[in-house]
């Protein structure tokens, strides 16, 4: 694909590192496609676009727009206008061509927007909390999920938080509704809050967070999204939402170390999420244990 304005700066240089251009973003999408596509392909995807870079106007595109690139697949979500999805490297580059800096897919089964295939717990710290507090919180969520017979994975968000993500089975006997998916995430989050009310809150309002980690379970309903693993972030520092092993989640972890300046070295390392889909388990026993 021929890029228009390939030298357009999308992220300014930082700490002696050069600016990141549209051509650089396209090269990243090409290099990381094998890691990104399993998490976005055939899923309705919202895109954060910044055609003039992160210093210009930024907007959230949910639906296909007139003249959408033919490399993007249209996904029917029973709405007036379909969503789009990148199903191959050409689709990812097309998103980059349009100034698409962030990928936020539904947590649904590929090809079936009505069936959830994962649960995301978004750990969002109050201003002033240390990242080590987020690390400790992620370990609490991990233990809770494992106690329920499920397998949690973890990633940076490209910002100040962490996501704990749980793959679930979608076969005919195991699949659950969006309502069940969200109810489970809420029940687990509330249980964690009750056990440690001084550390966690499930209240969205900023004023209620005072020194606590917000357990955001709201990313688990129909049409809700979460930033994809390996997605860039439209923020200073050109961070990437980076999949981690649990062994990496320890004191000293620096989420800003995963960015578009060093992705080549990151891609040479084994994928900590290579077993994400094979770790799926039915959510139904855990729902029963939570009284749902």
Predicted regions and their residues:
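Charge-rich, low-complexity segments
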Residues: 1-96
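C-terminal accessory nucleic-acid interaction domains of nucleic acid-metabolism proteins
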Residues: 1-27, 37, 41-42, 98-118, ...
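Short beta-strand
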Residues: 48-51, 152-158, 203-207
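A generic structural signal for beta-strand entry/edge sites
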Residues: 69, 81-83, 116-118, 161, ...
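Signature for HUH/AEP ssDNA processing cores
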Residues: 83-158, 168-180, 292
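A short beta-strand motif that forms the metal-chelation/ATP-contact edge
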Residues: 162-169, 213-217
